[in-house]
């Protein structure tokens, strides 16, 4: 009983079903209205600067380049710390 009532409402409310275009256009317009607009960032807005107005990303690249192989990533550092804890707890020599 509910299905014929809904179908009848769609036919009268949104246009005829024989064309099909009215329903499709309305749905696509609704979907377009729900899409968020893209945020456009300029390069100056996307990058942060320190107190001396120097680009932090460029400074970090220079620091890492100077350190060379001595620089450790966060994952490598945490793995190293975990290995040291296991050695202390288990009093076992392990290859880190």
UniProtKB/Swiss-Prot annotation:
It comes from the Eukaryota. It is found in: Secreted. One of its GO terms (molecular function) is ion channel regulator activity. A divalent metal cation binds at residues 82, 86. Keywords: Calcium, Disulfide bond, Gamma-carboxyglutamic acid, Ion channel impairing toxin, Ionotropic glutamate receptor inhibitor, Magnesium, Metal-binding, Neurotoxin, Postsynaptic neurotoxin, Secreted, Signal, Toxin. The modification 4-carboxyglutamate is found at residues 75-76, 82, 86, 95. Disulfide bonds join 83-96. The keyword Calcium applies. Residues 1-24 form the signal peptide. Expressed by the venom duct. Residues 28-57 are annotated as: Disordered. Residues 44-57 have a biased composition (Basic and acidic residues). GO terms for cellular component: extracellular region; host cell postsynaptic membrane. The keyword Magnesium applies. Conantokins inhibit N-methyl-D-aspartate (NMDA) receptors. This toxin has the highest potency for the NR2B/GRIN2B subunit, followed by NR2A/GRIN2A, NR2C/GRIN2C, and NR2D/GRIN2D subunits. Belongs to the conotoxin B superfamily. Adopts an alpha-helical conformation in presence and in absence of divalent cations. Calcium facilitates disulfide bond formation of the synthetic peptide. The cysteine framework is C-C. This is Conantokin-E.
